[in-house]
UniProtKB/Swiss-Prot annotation:
GO biological process, one term: retrograde vesicle-mediated transport, Golgi to endoplasmic reticulum
Top-level division of the source organism's lineage: Eukaryota
Compartments it resides in: Cytoplasm; Golgi apparatus membrane; Cytoplasmic vesicle, COPI-coated vesicle membrane
Alphabetically ordered keywords of this record: Cytoplasm, Cytoplasmic vesicle, ER-Golgi transport, Golgi apparatus, Membrane, Protein transport, Transport
Entry-linked InterPro entries: AP_mu_sigma_su, Coatomer_zeta, Longin-like_dom_sf
Statement: the UniProt record of this protein carries the keyword Protein transport: yes
Major localization class: cytoplasm
Organism: Arabidopsis thaliana
Name of this protein: Coatomer subunit zeta-2
Family designation: Belongs to the adaptor complexes small subunit family.
UniProt membrane topology term: Peripheral membrane protein
Amino acid sequence: MSPDSCPLVKNILLLDSEGKRVAVKYYSDDWPTNAAKLSFEKYVFSKTSKTNARTEAEITLLDSNIIVYKFAQDLHFFVTGGENENELILASVLQGFFDAVALLLRSNVEKMEALENLDLIFLCLDEMVDQGVVLETDPNVIAGKVAMQSTEASGSLSEQTLTQALATAREHLARSLLT
């Protein structure tokens, strides 16, 4: 398979309702400086913020980039690809990211919850895309891998608070019942 036939993502942005960064990941050198990245984010936000992308993802073409986006509560999700990329693949990346975040945040997809769980969101991005190449779009697989990594990193049950231990036990029980 040639590199040209592989769909590439240029960036994934998670912005708040004012266009400020919550979590962003760039996979392209199209924006070489931090100032260029911030300018792009502001531009994308200003062009899309007036649309109603709450129920379904919307697609737009801005500066030779296809941008697929969706809003939830006070968060705005964006996936950017080149003008020749397949919109359906970009939309599936967006939906996979959105649904995985919703699973990890227990359907409480809002800015404060996202900021409190920023590590999970970045792990989610790492599981989905590597150097622009789409690895996974299934939200259950993504959330499962992230949850597995976060429980491994959290250490033993004695180091966790009681509520964290109960949540971990509940997740392990649910996983064992499903398999």
